[in-house]
Amino acid sequence: MSRVSQARNLGKYFLLIDNMLVVLGFFVVFPLISIRFVDQMGWAAVMVGIALGLRQFIQQGLGIFGGAIADRFGAKPMIVTGMLMRAAGFATMGIAHEPWLLWFSCLLSGLGGTLFDPPRSALVVKLIRPQQRGRFFSLLMMQDSAGAVIGALLGSWLLQYDFRLVCATGAVLFVLCAAFNAWLLPAWKLSTVRTPVREGMTRVMRDKRFVTYVLTLAGYYMLAVQVMLMLPIMVNDVAGAPSAVKWMYAIEACLSLTLLYPIARWSEKHFRLEHRLMAGLLIMSLSMMPVGMVSGLQQLFNLICLFYIGSIIAEPARETLSASLADARARGSYMGFSRLGLAIGGAIGYIGGGWLFDLGKSAHQPELPWMMLGIIGIFTFLALGWQFSQKRAARRLLERDA
């Protein structure tokens, strides 16, 4: 086996262990934020939505800067610094009794993610061969689902005693992850050339096809982020107990572990990436619309199952499509910018979703936020379809002219 192949194989195992630590640290804390501050402390959902949206927007919106800096200086220093910063954010969250302190803790957490997330994504693109990326992203998603359940179960158990224990556990896991990267991650370059920060960012901004695709995905993310805000609140309201939230993540884990990899393997042989992304988005959108009209936990979990199936179909295709469009000369910048759709969609989804949830509750129209999210998903589906049809038309025109 050549040294390059050996490095790739070892890199896969490193990425999987690193991903598990990050997922556990994140899901111990974040799914319980809405339960802690809305249900237990009586805050308005929009206040918590602002905090979650702030974290999302900072982490993903500034990702292009984190990626461009990593292109220049390498992945290791950015990843270690970012993970320690997230640990500090979680420690601060444990003592948050005023909205401003929760917002500050989410700001710290988001800045940490800005530093470590783009270089981690770029390492996947660097180490995994193009023909293997779809399957590897599926493995990461399966791991995400299992880690989400374990993290949510651990966090729910700790929440019975003290929310500070929840946050301390998340902080410790990120400190461990920082130590793991500091000890074992080689000083790898992310790009084929050492790209100056400004040049990497400029290269991305001039790629109009990539920019349009990323911004359109904001609508997709408005739906996806509700697993952190409105769906846990809805499950808690219907069940009457925060402990039911862990079953929501258990459903995701069961579906992901049994269906994600087989669906990815089968669909990559029969369907284009864009068709898989659009099909998953359509299922997610349609499953959102009736959520506000259900009154039983079984009905709600059925819709959540449908939502997760849509995500299982869409997410590996979205990740693979984003990676395939990235320029190898500025991988960090591209993967950082690819998070901008999540920044915009996540911020609007959290803040707008929280506001619509409060509005629907006060107006005795609980279906309002869910119908709006479904409509947004349908419009995003149509916009993606138009983009992909334009790309195919341009390709056919070039082939004919040739």
Swiss-Prot record:
Cytoplasmic-side positions: 1-12, 117-138, 186-213, 265-276, 321-339, 389-402
Bilayer-crossing regions: 13-33, 99-116, 139-159, 165-185, 214-234, 244-264, 277-297, 300-320, 340-360, 368-388
Membrane topology listed for this record: Multi-pass membrane protein
Keyword Iron-sulfur belongs to the record: no
Keyword Secreted: no
Gene Ontology annotations of biological process type: response to antibiotic
Keywords, comma-separated and alphabetical: Antibiotic resistance, Cell inner membrane, Cell membrane, Membrane, Transmembrane, Transmembrane helix, Transport
Functional summary from the UniProt entry: Confers resistance to norfloxacin and enoxacin.
UniProt-recorded name of the protein: Multidrug resistance protein MdtH
Organism: Escherichia coli O9:H4 (strain HS)
